[in-house]
Amino acid sequence: MARYAAFLRGININKRRARNTDLIACLEEVGFEEPAVFRASGNLVFEGPSGASVEKIPARLEDGLKKSLGFEVPVFLRTARQIKAIAGQEPFAAKEVKASKGKLQVALLASKPTAAAKKRTLALATDKDKLAIRGSELYWLPSAGTQDSELGMKGIEDAIGPMTMRTMGTIEQIAAKYFS
């Protein structure tokens, strides 16, 4: 069995609510084992068959979530190796991260961005909002909180494509708890 992390976009925001027990039941219904929910914010960990096609898992889970919850939920899947690699990334100098009043954010992308998408996205960076791209992740270091940033999520997404955002701290905690 291989272990995966699935990050759900827009769950438990406004009327798009899902209880942890419902998410676990959904994972089991679509055939995944050892399901767990990390916090109530759409972070799922589960085991799937080692031979399973990683490319097909998000659609399988999205279909199950739609049937179970009654609304569409985009899924951003990462393997154990990918989670460990993301948690180990240091896209900005340690002194920059320490000096920032904002938390380092990780945007999990649907796929690796094209060169043109990278260029458009990185052009949005400012002195107050630093951006870096590594693989299928965008790292954002806001000088203050993301809500106070001049750089909006919509602008980033328009440049790079669909994504869901987590703090680096959340990714590190998931890596330590489920993938160590």
Enumerate the predicted regions with their spans.
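Surface-exposed, charge/polar-rich loops and edge strands
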Residues: 2-41, 45-180
